[in-house]
Amino acid sequence: MAVDKEVQLHAQAWEHALSYINSTALSAAVELEIPDILEDHGGLMSLSELSAASGCPREPLYRLMRFLIFHGIFTKSDDCYAQSPLSRLFTRENLGPYMLMQATPVTRSPAGLSGEALKTGTSLYLKSIRGEDSWSDPAYGYHMKAFTNAMIAHARLTAAAIVSNYPAAFDGLRSVVDVGGRHGTAIGRLVEAFPWVRGIAFDLPEIVADAPPRKGVDFVGGDMFESVPKADAVMLMWILHDWSDDKCIEILKKCKEAIPASTGKVMIVDAIINEDGEGDEFSGARLSLDMIMLAVMAQGKERTYKEWVHLLNEAGFSKHTVKNIKSIESVIEAYP
């Protein structure tokens, strides 16, 4: 049967026009804890069983699952539902919390990424709507709780990727300070894997004050724009993409001051946007992250390799390496 290219184009246009519903539907399933329910059950579940366990009525649940099965998230056999390798990545221990954060009004608001917002430069959602800073508005407590849970989940996954794919990064290190380390999830996982390392979780005093104790991790409060605790290495995991180039250079200079001039290094764990068409499996996701930054953060962005090199040169680093860790992030190691 001949392929009607015009029909294909129209179908593709409809897919783009409606594509936002893909993540919306998946977020609804995560909110209903369907991936965790199926995982805990350990086998096939009927619609009635899944409805009872999730608290969602049969008819809307059926339609939701029909959509997600069509898109390859879950599987179905003999009118019963089951996990797939993909849906397992959306349990509470994986990307589930990140999906919930992306579903909050702050993240999803069309005010963030609109033509008008881009023209006026008010891409930060709360600034464009209320003239307030997203980090300090108490009315957005729900978003911030979801954000915190998402960052914990992300830290676990990224630390695991480093342990699996670049353990040599910690060879010879006695101490590592995680700048913006919040409650120490990432550095805690890394210290577990590399017990000869003393970890330091460094964040604002009000954040580290609530941190639970972690073996091998010290918590230090402070301001990364003023000084960074001294260590053999400094790690910046998903920190610099929040800031403008000028602010990133300030942060990097403070990190450079905190490490030994002859043996220290700064480890930047962040996305690198690919612009040469070669890329990898995560190239599209990295571009999507940049659209989120464009919508939510006034100054932040994901950067290309050339843009990262510019920051490192301006901050006074003499050399650097880049390591692919089979993740949405890479590890950039910068040396004084």
From Swiss-Prot:
Changing G181S: Reduced ability to use cirsimaritin (CIRM) as substrate but unchanged efficiency toward scutellarein-7-methyl ether (SCU7Me). Coiled coil: none annotated. It is an enzyme of class 2 (transferase). The keyword Iron does not apply. The active site is at H241 (proton acceptor). It catalyses: scutellarein 7-methyl ether + S-adenosyl-L-methionine = ladanein + S-adenosyl-L-homocysteine + H(+); cirsimaritin + S-adenosyl-L-methionine = salvigenin + S-adenosyl-L-homocysteine + H(+); cirsiliol + S-adenosyl-L-methionine = eupatorin + S-adenosyl-L-homocysteine + H(+); genkwanin + S-adenosyl-L-methionine = apigenin 4',7-dimethyl ether + S-adenosyl-L-homocysteine. GO terms for biological process: methylation. Its EC number is 2.1.1.-. Homodimer. Flavonoid 4'-O-methyltransferase involved in the biosynthesis of polymethoxylated flavonoids natural products such as nevadensin and salvigenin, aroma compounds which contribute to the flavor of sweet basil, and exhibit pharmacological activities such as anti-allergic, anti-oxidant, antibacterial, anti-proliferative, and anti-inflammatory effects. This is Flavonoid 4'-O-methyltransferase 3. It comes from Ocimum basilicum. The gene is FOMT3.
